[in-house]
UniProtKB/Swiss-Prot annotation:
Record EC number: 4.2.2.n1
Gene transcribed to yield this protein: mltF
Organism: Alteromonas mediterranea (strain DSM 17117 / CIP 110805 / LMG 28347 / Deep ecotype)
Name used for this protein in its record: Membrane-bound lytic murein transglycosylase F
Stretches for region LT domain: 273-463
Any one Gene Ontology BP term: peptidoglycan catabolic process
Function: Murein-degrading enzyme that degrades murein glycan strands and insoluble, high-molecular weight murein sacculi, with the concomitant formation of a 1,6-anhydromuramoyl product. Lytic transglycosylases (LTs) play an integral role in the metabolism of the peptidoglycan (PG) sacculus. Their lytic action creates space within the PG sacculus to allow for its expansion as well as for the insertion of various structures such as secretion systems and flagella.
UniProt free text on domains: The N-terminal domain does not have lytic activity and probably modulates enzymatic activity. The C-terminal domain is the catalytic active domain.
Active site: 317
Signal sequence range: 1-33
Catalytic activity: Exolytic cleavage of the (1->4)-beta-glycosidic linkage between N-acetylmuramic acid (MurNAc) and N-acetylglucosamine (GlcNAc) residues in peptidoglycan, from either the reducing or the non-reducing ends of the peptidoglycan chains, with concomitant formation of a 1,6-anhydrobond in the MurNAc residue
HAMAP family: MltF (MF_02016)
Length: 463
């Protein structure tokens, strides 16, 4: 992620914004909400724990919302004081009472919440999905559900369902058969897990959270979409002036224009939008069974790499089948060619230890060939693409990226050009010619999904 480079260019812009605001203000010396938090030198933000919002990972605080918030604090030149809450209502009351400056939970804006709070600009749009366990009877209509829908109290989903049930009761001659039950004992991710386990029949989740959890629980299925294209935005106190909102508009405009928002969105969601039920079930089963045979070897030869990333690559290559062979003759756990095996002293490509050792060292050499100015995780994704199609074709894609006005050092830009390598009007201009770049793109995105799943399974003690 190249957030630091972008942030350095953004930090001074707030000074210009404030200067304009001060000069245009007709009443001097009246503090605004923005000037108050700048004087305090901190911004107080309420949030909730979650894979897409905020959590403490192995490398410190992480999460899509967290990185956006940290960027905004850096943009203002203040400290981010982040307060995770276990209750939406308590958190929202703290915002109303002026004890928080912003609430950022990765939730959609509902009409009920909009009457209660002001909001910054919409930065994403999501669908609200009615979720049930795959294999159960798919409900045809919300009014005919035979079990309650469970939602987190105070969440966007609870507000949405409350409004839907009220409308159904007014429109239907007969009473709605099911009911909404809200809880503060479980968060939205736990409710999805409970649906997957069969402990509850239904919940509602936004498309972002569902996409993150379906890799972990492939038997989560969508019964129907309850609401499409709902905006996501950060909540602000309703009665305060618009100074913080104006700063948010400037901030999001700048990070969109700079490309940093696109990079961040790709980091958390770019590889999980597509879901394959069969593949996810097969992978999770293999991770909890077959992987145990080779885990120690991946750990032994990973070197500076995360062993789980190396294992994810191997699954994409061979499904952890040491005897695997492709139609082009590559073989083994890491699917090495004869030439690559020779270069890295692999005598028997079907020998698990030799294959993992050779594959890891070959991949490390590709990483070292990626220009040093390219930061992580872009370096890794580009090296991974070159493992699949070769460094020459990767460079062709990077050149096409630059020619088309993209950034050749950003994976999110380069991956859009990889499929062009099999289109004649593009590959005829490249040095290395035709390549199945679309397959290289899918190769990398699959590994990213497998890696995320392995990290989670490892944290759960399942591998």
């Amino acid at each position: 992620m190249q957030s630091q480079d972008y942030k350095k260019r953004l930090k001074l812009q707030i000074i210009i914004i404030l200067s304009i605001a001060v000069m245009s203000c007709g009443v001097p010396n009246v503090p605004t909400a923005l000037s108050s938090l700048l004087e305090r030198e901190s911004i107080r933000v309420g949030t909730v724990y979650g894979a897409g919002t905020f959590y403490n990972g192995a490398e410190g605080p992480q999460g899509f919302e967290y990185e956006l918030l940290a960027g905004f604090a850096d943009y203002l030149g203040v400290t981010l004081d982040l307060y995770p809450f276990y209750s939406y209502e308590v958190m929202l009351e703290q915002l109303e009472e002026g004890n928080l400056d912003i609430v950022a939970t990765g939730d959609a804006v509902t009409p009920a919440l909009k009457r209660r709070f002001a909001y910054g600009p919409a930065y994403q749009r999501v669908e609200q999905e009615l979720v049930f366990q795959a294999g159960a009877t798919r409900p045809r209509d919300l009014a005919e559900l035979d079990s309650p829908i469970i939602a987190v109290a105070g969440s966007s989903q609870a507000h949405l369902l409350s409004n839907l049930f009220k409308r159904l009761s007014e429109e239907e001659d007969e009473a709605v058969q099911t009911q909404l039950i809200t809880t503060e004992d479980s968060d939205s991710e736990e409710l999805l897990q409970q649906v997957a386990n069969g402990d509850i029949a239904y919940t509602v989740a936004d498309s972002n959270r569902l996409a993150l959890q379906r890799r972990r629980y492939p038997n989560l299925a969508v019964a129907r979409t309850l609401n499409e294209n709902m905006p996501m935005a950060w909540a602000l106190p309703l009665q305060q002036d618009d100074s913080v909102k104006a700063a948010l508009i400037e901030y999001f405009g700048t990070v969109h224009q700079s490309g940093w928002f696109t990079v961040l969105e790709d980091k958390y969601f770019g590889h999980i939008r597509q879901f394959d039920y069969v593949d996810s079930r097969a992978f999770n089963y293999a991770a909890e069974s077959t992987l145990t045979q080779y885990k120690s070897l991946f750990q032994k030869y990973a070197g500076d790499l995360d062993w789980r990333l190396l294992a994810a690559m191997s699954y994409q290559e061979s499904h952890w089948n040491s005897d695997a062979i492709s139609r082009t003759g590559v073989r083994g756990l890491m699917m090495l060619t004869l030439a690559t095996a020779s270069d890295w002293n692999v005598d028997d490509r079907t020998d698990p230890e030799q294959s993992i050792r050779g594959g890891s060292r070959y991949f490390a050499s590709l990483l070292n060939r990626i220009p040093a100015r390219i930061s992580e995780p872009d370096r890794t994704w580009m090296a991974m693409a070159s493992y699949n199609i070769g460094m020459g074709h990767l460079e062709d894609a990077r050149i096409l990226t630059e020619q088309q006005g993209g950034n050749p050092d950003l994976w999110v830009d380069v991956k859009r050009r990889l499929p062009q390598l099999r289109q004649k009007k593009y590959y005829r201009t490249t040095r290395y010619g035709y390549a199945r770049g679309d397959e290289a793109l899918q190769y990398v995105e699959n590994i990213r999904r497998y890696y995320d799943s392995l990290v989670w399974l490892d944290e759960q003690g399942k591998i």
